[in-house]
């Protein structure tokens, strides 16, 4: 898929998330523990516009604490509609060239974080292009987020597709699902994703409960 198509899909997810945020309001729950829709909006604004906060999203300790404080402050002090308007305006000029690879997964996940924070959610349909765009990120992203899963040979597959190895060695398990569902599962939203795990029952249980993330 071209970079231009990837960027278009990222922009579509951005717009859909902005519409949803305004629809549910700042106090709506999300799948991110402790975060309301206002925290989500603040996070997305700061992530693209504040390098000091961006570092805290990948580095632990004081960096992470600084990012958490900045997010809490923005969520509480900046009007919600203004935060959403900043998100909708798109990324700053310096990062527009990497909008697709930088943002397509981010905005898909956070849109679903808001959508799936209710008991009656269902997967979106008609997302073939988006699913195709998310698939190339699965191997590297899943490998990174499962680095603390030990002694497991992990494969992933789309429904009806050929499995792809993510981690080799150890006891084998295969995760099967649409790329969007695999994304949600390995971003830690396991209870709010539709992924089938096949393999030894003990290994399947391990993958379902093992720590996942950065």
Please describe what each predicted stretch is:
Residues 2-7, 24-27, 50-66, 82, ...:
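Structured surface interface patches that mediate subunit assembly and partner/cofactor docking
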Residues 2-56:
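An N-terminal domain-cap segment
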Residues 10-19, 75-86:
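Short, charged, amphipathic alpha-helices and their helix-cap/turn boundaries
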Residues 11, 31-34, 74-77, 101-104:
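Generic alpha-helical scaffold signal
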Residues 36-37, 79, 178:
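Short, structural beta-strand-to-alpha-helix junction motif
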């Amino acid at each position: 898929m071209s970079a231009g198509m990837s960027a278009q899909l990222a922009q579509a997810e951005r717009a859909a998330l902005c519409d949803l945020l305004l629809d549910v309001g700042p106090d709506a729950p999300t799948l991110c523990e402790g975060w309301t829709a206002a925290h989500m909006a603040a996070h997305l604004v700061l992530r693209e516009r504040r390098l000091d906060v961006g570092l805290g999203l990948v580095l632990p300790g004081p960096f992470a604490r600084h990012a958490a404080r900045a997010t809490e402050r923005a969520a509480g002090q900046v009007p919600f509609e203004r935060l959403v308007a900043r998100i909708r305006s798109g990324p700053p000029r310096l990062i527009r060239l990497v909008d697709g690879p930088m943002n397509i997964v981010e905005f898909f996940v956070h849109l679903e974080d808001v959508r799936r924070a209710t008991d009656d959610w269902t997967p979106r349909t008609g997302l073939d292009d988006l699913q195709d765009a998310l698939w190339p990120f699965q191997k590297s992203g899943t490998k990174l987020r499962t680095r603390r899963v030990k002694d497991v040979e992990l494969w992933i597959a789309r429904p009806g597709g050929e499995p792809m190895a993510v981690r080799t060695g150890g006891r084998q398990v295969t995760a099967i699902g649409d790329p969007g569902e695999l994304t949600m599962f390995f971003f830690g939203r396991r209870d709010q994703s539709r992924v089938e795990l096949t393999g030894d029952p003990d290994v399947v249980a391990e993958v379902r409960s093992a720590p996942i993330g950065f």
